[in-house]
């Protein structure tokens, strides 16, 4: 079992409880190594130290740690130090990916995003560090998983939000299952992901996304991502799947 966290509320007690309950891996977000760069996007009020402590706490409790990082104009020069820190603390996987024009990122995109040259330079640097690091270092493409959906007709991961809703993707405001109403076992047995990808709303969304710039919080006909409740097609998908026996 794995989870993602900003790390700010992690304590020894929380890590111990999560480990006992079966947590194997946690991915923390580390968007800078100075209070200035971190809070330029996180607005945590000087709580970067809590994130750094969370990484150490998780490792002390035998939990595998991955780190995700958002490159932006204030932290671009910190990546050698960020990677040094992660290697020193035993982080197993480090992933950076370009800023996406979603949520606050959309409203502040011009102030935060790197130039194409900066993105290319950082990608090359990460590749070079990966070649000599025991830690897996990747430059991520947030569009890749949507290509995989279209090619395979399956959704190979489960995206659960704070409301117990499963979505097609963290970047699309479409709920395909609700754990408050039905079990995860039913979701798997009924192969709901297959029906979700065939649904016309989902199909139209996936068809229009070819590159990073195609993402937006305000797609026509959809709720504003992170600000309005998702479109919920979960009951419709469940009804269809039960009629067809999940195939």
Residue ranges and their predicted role:
Residues 56-65, 83-88, 117-132, 148-159, ...:
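A short, terminal or domain-edge coil/loop segment
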Residues 9, 33, 72, 100-101, ...:
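Short, solvent-exposed loop/turn segments at secondary-structure junctions
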Residues 171-247:
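Flexible mid-to-C-terminal extensions adjoining Fe-S/redox cofactors in radical SAM and related proteins
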Residues 64, 76-78, 102-168, 210-217:
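A C-terminal junction/extension of Radical SAM enzymes
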Residues 44-48, 113-116, 178-182:
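Short, conserved loop/turn and helix-capping segments at secondary-structure boundaries
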């Amino acid at each position: 079992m794995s989870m993602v966290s900003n790390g700010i509320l992690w304590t020894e007690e929380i890590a111990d409880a999560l480990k006992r309950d079966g947590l194997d891996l946690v991915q923390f977000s580390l968007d800078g190594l100075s209070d200035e760069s971190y809070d330029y996007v996180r607005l945590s009020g000087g709580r970067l130290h809590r994130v750094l402590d969370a990484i150490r706490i998780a490792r002390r409790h035998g939990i595998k740690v991955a780190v995700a990082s958002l490159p932006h104009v204030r932290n671009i020069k910190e990546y050698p130090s960020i990677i040094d820190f992660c290697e020193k603390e035993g982080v197993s996987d480090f992933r950076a990916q370009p800023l996406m024009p979603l949520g606050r990122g959309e409203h502040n995109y011009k102030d935060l995003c790197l130039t194409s040259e900066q993105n290319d330079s950082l990608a090359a640097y990460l590749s070079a560090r990966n070649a000599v690091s025991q830690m897996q270092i990747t430059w991520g493409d947030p569009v890749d998983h949507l290509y995989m959906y279209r090619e395979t007709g399956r959704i190979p991961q489960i995206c659960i939000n704070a409301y117990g809703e499963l979505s097609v993707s963290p970047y699309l405001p479409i709920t395909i299952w609700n754990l408050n109403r039905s079990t995860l076992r039913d979701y798997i047995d009924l192969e709901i992901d297959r029906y979700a990808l065939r649904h016309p709303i989902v199909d139209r969304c996936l068809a229009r996304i070819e590159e990073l710039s195609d993402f937006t919080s305000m797609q026509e006909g959809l709720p504003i991502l992170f600000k309005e409740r998702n479109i919920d097609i979960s009951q419709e998908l469940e009804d269809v799947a039960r009629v067809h026996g999940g195939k």
